[in-house]
Structure formats: structure tokens, C-alpha cells
Amino acid sequence: MIASESTTHVEQYQDIFKRLAGAINEHLELKQDLDESKVRGIVDEAVAAARLPRPVEVHMPDGTVNTLSERTHRQFEQVLSLIGEGHSNIMLVGPAGTGKTTLVKHAAKALGRSFAFISLSAGVTETHIFGRMLPQSDGTWAYVESPFIRIYRNGGVFLFDEVDAADGNVMVSINAALANGVLCNPVNGEVIERHADCVIVAAANTYGRGGDMVYVGRNALDGATLDRFVLSKINVGYDTDLEADMATAVGSKGQALVDWVNRLRDRIADNRLRRIASTRLVEQGVKALSAGRTLEDVKSRFFQDWSADEKSKVGEEA
């Protein structure tokens, strides 16, 4: 399968320059003064108009073309490539807020398949994954299928989110379903064959080797579990292009926000701080700026629970 944008990056930049030239010529013809603020306004309008989401066309092996109108993560094609290679188990590893869940959801939509997910917190048990037996009005008990079993049986894309936070016994129960192509449901004893179009994705903040400096409470995953994802792991980073697109909604203020977030990430990494500056910071920052708040307001909110030493290390006043 092949994913392609209906408009190339070259065409996109040509569109930006064309819009800029047209707007500036219009001002010159009207003999209007072009001060710095007007030039900034023209640039902001041109860039915002040219960076609207471009439809993505996914060409399926049977010749059909699925079109995705939403803006996709820059690693979207990597996920589709692994599926195209025949990988039915995929692992996405990356910091919080990089868009892993949305990335998988978009992949399912592009493939024309159903999508479901579960976050594997410590309280999740086998019944959440494999279904449960519930009492009926006539006094009997009936099995109620879970979203995972439905997709395993009928095809689709299922996401196990936060797998490095899961109970170890739960992951062992999932192992057979990941590798053997068949599952003996521990709830009702039914043997279910895995559908050929069933893709199972595991998302984590670590590589399953235990907690690290930031994600302290993460569990180590069993070696048998990790082996299910050999050659099908993707390190998912922040999509700075997507963040820049978000920021165009507030013009030059948005660019200042993005520049600050990028510098902040570098300083967090350089000083090995247990802090996160995710895409959500950009998203919520754009909302605040759109509502009339300033970048200083955004910073004040973000740093309210930081220590003076932490602020100093990232270049902010205590």
C-alpha cells in the first residue's frame, strides 16, 4: 500500500510564495503603505491558507484508494509501511503526547478498518480484554464480547495503550493472541482464529525494560512479549510540522509559542529533568493565545508547579 499527499511540499511552498506575491502586489497597486505590521499580517494569512491539511490518498493492493482528509502525523507512512510488509503486531514507543493514539486511529481509517483501544492501567483485568459473562433476565449467564475479541475475530486495528504500565499477568495472557494466530478465550473457552486483517498495536513510553528517569513507574515487559514485535517497533517523536500547523491559527504569536516549546524541550533533555513538553502544550497554548492570553500567561501556567531550580535550568526566572 502507498500513502501520498495530493499536494507535494514543493507545490505547497510555491502556493505560499504565490499568495505572498499576489497580496503584496495588490497593496502596491492600491498605493498603500507597507509597514512591518502589514507585512507580518500578509505573511501570516498566506502561510495559514497554504498550510491547511492536505488530503492523503492510500492506494490499497486491490486497487481501491482511501482518502484521509485529516492532518496526519509525519510518521504515518512508517506505520502503513510496516502493515504493508505484513506485520500484524506493531509497537510504538515515544514520550507522552506525541500523538501515538491518533496515529493508530488514522492508520485504521486510511485502511478502511474498524478501530478500538484500551489503556492498560494497573486495574485492567482479563475480562476487560477478553469479554465477560453477565447474568440475563431469565437467570442464565451469557458471554458479552469485548472490542478486542470483536476485532480479533472480524478484522480491524486494535491499540493496547500504555502496555508498559500493564499488569505482567495480563500481558502474558495476550501473548498467545499476538503470536499464534489463534486465541483460546479464557472467559468462555472459545477458540478464535485471528482474522487476516487484524492488526494489533502496542503503545508505550519505554521499550519495556522498566522505568526510566521520566517514566519511573513503568514495568518491564516479558521477553516473550517483546519478541512479538521484532522488527516492527517505531520510535515516535513529536511532529514539529503538525505543531507548526496548529500554531498558524494565531499567526506570529503561534510561531513564538512553537519556538519556545522547542527550546524548552532541548533544555529539559540537556538537564535531564523529569518534565514533559508535549504536543499538548502547543495545542493548549494555541487555545490560550486565541482567547487573548499572552505567551507569558502560557508560561506562567505551565511553570506553576516547577521548582526554582528547574525553572533556572530551562532559562526561566524563578
Residue ranges and their predicted role:
Residues M1-A318:
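C-terminal regulatory/interaction module of P-loop NTP-utilizing enzymes
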